[in-house]
Amino acid sequence: MSSTRTFPGESSAVSSADSSLSASAQPREITIAHSPDSDDAFMFYGLATNKVRVPGLRFTHTLSDIETLNRKAMDGNGAYDVTAISFHAYPYIQEHYALLPSGGSVGEGYGPMIVAKRAFSEESIQRKRIAIPGKLTTAYLVLNLFAPGIETDVVPFDQIIPELLEGKHEAGLIIHEGQLTYTRSGLYRVLDLGAWWHKTTGLPLPLGGNAIRRSLGPELMAKVGAALRESIQYALDHREEALNYAMQFARDLDSRSADKFVGMYVNQRTLDYGTDGREAVRRLLEMGHEAGIIPHAAQVDFVG
């Protein structure tokens, strides 16, 4: 079940130096959507709480699970000006969206995991039926690269571990905070797909990023992209403050675990993918297309 929340970020203050905006001018609304997870909350902290303001713009934030955001981005011209997406979804929305150069969640030799109630070999994964968090998630794409044609059942990401414990599935593909909490439930890690990806390609695993609507135009796209980067930098520079805010979204994590999770997915690479990070996005989508998982080739386009 998806969970959607909306709250305003009134980033509309006009600086005294900006004489181009009159006192009566209405700020331009920019709609932003991201997942209700501690890492996303951390990176958007600056914008969501007005620590980062952009003259002439007002940001409103919608929170929803990543598979729902993937689907909404595919709806017509897309539901939001800026949206978090799984990289697997990008080829389906590339006509209307470009990728922002910051805001990515990238695993450095780690990533989504296959877990189960009992241990079994990596080689036997192909013969299992796996609970997955959505068919547009990057986790699902990488699972199919590892085990082509594997049988799966779509389950809301936050229900995968409970359903494994109830015996409804042989194994589950976990994302988000589940990567740190699965052992509390007595589950075994069968495979870390981020580690497999790094061993196979030598690259980090790009899981998700932020896409921006092309119809905003180059100037506004760049301005919004700079605001997001400033928000991430603010959170990194004011870590304790931003972590305290992010804790309200940290499902089942104590402050120490939330700090660890945020550190895994919000770091210097979140500010800038780097050459190898951008190459990893291209390689991932190329491999998905070549394997027949993605029906058409991706034209990876970063703003700047």
Give the positions of each predicted feature.
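Hydrophobic residues within well-ordered alpha-helices
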Residues: 72-76, 164-165, 224, 288
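Beta->alpha turn/N-cap motifs
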Residues: 65-67, 75-91, 156-157, 174-180
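Secondary-structure end/capping motifs
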Residues: 217-287
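Bilobed "Venus flytrap"/periplasmic-binding protein-like clamshell domains
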Residues: 25, 29-49, 112-171, 175-177, ...
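A structural signal for short loop-to-beta-strand junctions that line the ligand-binding cleft
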Residues: 30-31, 96-104, 129
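Pocket-lining segment of extracytoplasmic ligand-binding domains
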Residues: 158-248
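A local structural motif
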Residues: 52-63, 146-159, 294-300
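Hydrophobic/proline-rich hinge and linker segments of small-molecule sensing/allosteric domains
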Residues: 99-122, 145, 198-215
